């Protein structure tokens, strides 16, 4: 068999064996959070929103501009774009950017966004969008997004529970850490986190998002190849193998 062809086949085989996941910068980690809040330190509210009137959709955001927090009813959608159904709660302790230093966060892998859904009788809710932004002064230096909507069949009743925890995936944690490594410890502590979110099937509320510090080592998630990637790799391997067989047959 031609050595070059063999190298291509081996390369495709290695690509097939390498885990590949769909883009998702923020991932839900069921190993953290819950009523006991295992693996989390103190939480600080960053965003509070509630579906207006008898509606079941809600959205809200907070970011940094001109040295102050900017609160809005606009929330990001994981499917793309934004929605502005509202309504964001603007109380001093309800919606505000939070500093990394205020949470004792020094590493990107320690950042946790905790979603506390307050639904009647612990009913279901769907988080339809979530974006975390890191601000250095007024400059947005880093964004991480939820890859797809996440539905929670049951929720914790009452406000103040630890809720559902989202953290950066390994690639995004490394990317943010690379930025943090360029700053002094004081500059890292001064960085602020902003948030944009949306939810559906929200009949109670208000829903809150907290910033927390991950004190436990995150569990490494096993990645599964995407169907499209798997099909492409298998097809390519079969095709190249057939081509190699044809060439080898002609030599006899």
What are these model-predicted stretches?
Residues 225-244:
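A short, hydrophobic C-terminal helix/tail in secreted or cell-surface proteins
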Residues 21, 220, 227-229:
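Intrinsically disordered, low-complexity segments enriched in proline/serine/threonine
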Residues 3, 19, 225, 245-246:
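Residue-level micro-sites within transmembrane alpha helices that shape
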Residues 25-223:
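Helix-boundary and membrane-interface capping/anchor signal
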Residues 1-8:
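Bacterial N-terminal signal peptides that target proteins for export
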Residues 9-17:
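Bacterial N-terminal signal peptides
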Residues 18-24:
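Sec/Tat signal peptide C-region and signal peptidase I cleavage site
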Residues 242-252:
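C-terminal membrane-anchoring or membrane-association module
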């Amino acid at each position: 068999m031609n050595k070059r062809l063999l190298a291509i086949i081996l390369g495709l085989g290695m690509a097939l064996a390498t885990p590949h996941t769909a883009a998702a910068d923020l991932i839900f980690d069921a190993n953290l959070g819950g009523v006991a809040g295992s693996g989390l330190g103190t939480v600080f509210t960053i965003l509070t929103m509630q579906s207006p009137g008898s509606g079941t959709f809600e959205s809200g955001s907070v970011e940094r501009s001109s040295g102050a927090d900017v609160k809005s009813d606009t929330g990001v959608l994981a499917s793309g774009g934004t929605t502005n159904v509202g309504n964001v709660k603007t109380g001093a302790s309800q919606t505000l950017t939070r500093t990394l230093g205020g949470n004792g966060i020094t590493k990107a892998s320690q950042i946790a966004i905790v979603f506390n859904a307050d639904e009647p009788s612990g009913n279901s809710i769907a988080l339809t969008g979530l974006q975390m932004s890191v601000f250095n002064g007024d400059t947005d230096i880093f964004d991480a997004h939820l890859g797809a909507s996440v539905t929670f069949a049951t929720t914790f009743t009452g406000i103040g529970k630890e809720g559902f925890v989202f953290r950066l995936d390994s690639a995004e944690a490394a990317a943010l850490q690379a930025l943090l490594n360029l700053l002094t410890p004081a500059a890292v502590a001064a960085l602020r986190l902003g948030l944009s979110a949306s939810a559906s099937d929200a009949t109670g509320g208000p829903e809150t998002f907290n910033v927390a510090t991950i004190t436990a080592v995150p569990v490494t998630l096993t990645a599964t190849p995407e169907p499209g990637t798997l099909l492409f790799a298998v097809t390519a391997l079969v095709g190249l193998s057939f081509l190699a067989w044809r060439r080898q047959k002609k030599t006899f």
